[in-house]
Amino acid sequence: MVTIRADEISNIIRERIEQYNREVKIVNTGTVLQVGDGIARIHGLDEVMAGELVEFEEGTIGIALNLESNNVGVVLMGDGLMIQEGSSVKATGRIAQIPVSEAYLGRVINALAKPIDGRGEISASESRLIESPAPGIISRRSVYEPLQTGLIAIDSMIPIGRGQRELIIGDRQTGKTAVATDTILNQQGQNVICVYVAIGQKASSVAQVVTTFQERGAMEYTIVVAETADSPATLQYLAPYTGAALAEYFMYRERHTSIIYDDPSKQAQAYRQMSLLLRRPPGREAYPGDVFYLHSRLLERAAKSSSNLGEGSMTALPIVETQSGDVSAYIPTNVISITDGQIFLSADLFNAGIRPAINVGISVSRVGSAAQIKAMKQVAGKLKLELAQFAELEAFAQFASDLDKATQNQLARGQRLRELLKQSQAAPLAVEEQIMTIYTGTTGYLDSLEIGQVRKFLVALRAYVKTNKPQFQEIISSTKTFTEEAESLLKEAIQEQMDRFLLQEQA
């Protein structure tokens, strides 16, 4: 029989008592009253913060949005099909945040910064709040550097600067996303990090954009944040803020970033759905009263940092879809009033074969020529003026039967200038090539050509200058000025190429 030794037992008990660590943990918990349509009503959670993350018993995460006297309205970041009435919920004490790092470049992620491209986890040592305050007045400086889009119509007449917010607006199928993706393609070698946020888009459209970026080598400096049309409303609402947090990470590290929101009107619809289900009072077009704040707090995060903060920048290009050209609807007017200008794409121009279908007359950039290099300012002024006069004359010429020679010449020049602005998709032009193209048009060299020959000649001219007059591009890129030497080189090249071109056309 085993003998029991009391001293051993007492020693063991004494050791256990010494090692005992009394830990009191207070957990803020609640109970699910009802759940459905991506919304849960919770009883309890007395000390929960607005916007705090809460965790359900089966692992789903939600955000506390409505704090009422007897319950808390929570939006779910998932389908919530396993949540049951009466199950427990605990507050996490955290506000929504995401991991951030350089490793996100080249990846496709969702609104929670989780990879969805099947290429494994993303390593990150830092994190940022999804919602963070916009830089103050002292933290900013005025916009002065250009963000080249590669599109002649924009870079010459509606210039975008680094740190600006420029709205791209137009009906469906007018090439809005194409303008934005061309801008990303043009940032190759410009040391600009790009973030493309797809909100409520078709998965096939997002896949097409990602494929274009991969084929053109643009994914190296791009992050794609995607929440497609079948995603829960909560995640569609969060996606733009996730993209902004990633862009801010690079901006505060003294880098230049560009972020495209495609499109905020889908985010507003997701927010409207959440708000109505939370029984918040509806306002105009059934949107909640704070839908302006939804977009203003997002777009105000775009900035050009002051020299003390390293002069990084975040340029925002929101895309808004209009219904049959109605820019006076609620969301378009809101976003127009927040941004520093808009690029208006017209369905009529698109159908007339003018692509990109930018309506130069009503598009505007409130930063203006401050966001252009000197060489572009020198040649673009005349282009703007001549196109404006042409638009006026064209409307008048429809009613007049006999026009004098000067008017006919002006109309002919305008038609050739309009032709010069046409570009194929995914074919952005370097600023030197744009300057060369605009100069050729505004100085009348294209007047002798048929309208159908203009684009063919310009393609040949750009190739000719690249191979035979490389000094032209060197002068523009080094001095940023259209010098007399550059002008004489260009004149020679145009004349030589014109002679060759006319001979080829006759042959």
UniProtKB/Swiss-Prot annotation:
GO cellular component, one term: proton-transporting ATP synthase complex
PANTHER family, per the entry: ATP SYNTHASE SUBUNIT ALPHA, MITOCHONDRIAL
Statement: the UniProt record of this protein carries the keyword Lipoprotein: no
Catalytic activity: ATP + H2O + 4 H(+)(in) = ADP + phosphate + 5 H(+)(out)
InterPro entries: ATP_synth_asu-like_sf, ATP_synth_asu_C, ATP_synth_asu_C_sf, ATP_synth_F1_a_nt-bd_dom, ATP_synth_F1_asu, ATPase_a/bsu_AS, ATPase_F1/V1/A1_a/bsu_N, ATPase_F1/V1/A1_a/bsu_N_sf
Organism the protein comes from: Coffea arabica
Location of the protein in the cell: Plastid, Chloroplast thylakoid membrane
NCBIfam families in alphabetical order: atpA, PRK13343.1
Membrane topology qualifier: Peripheral membrane protein
Family assignment from sequence similarity: Belongs to the ATPase alpha/beta chains family.
Function description: Produces ATP from ADP in the presence of a proton gradient across the membrane. The alpha chain is a regulatory subunit.
Keyword check for Repeat: no
The protein's name in its UniProt record: ATP synthase subunit alpha, chloroplastic
UniProt keywords, alphabetically: ATP synthesis, ATP-binding, CF(1), Chloroplast, Hydrogen ion transport, Ion transport, Membrane, Nucleotide-binding, Plastid, Thylakoid, Translocase, Transport
Quaternary structure, from the entry: F-type ATPases have 2 components, CF(1) - the catalytic core - and CF(0) - the membrane proton channel. CF(1) has five subunits: alpha(3), beta(3), gamma(1), delta(1), epsilon(1). CF(0) has four main subunits: a, b, b' and c.
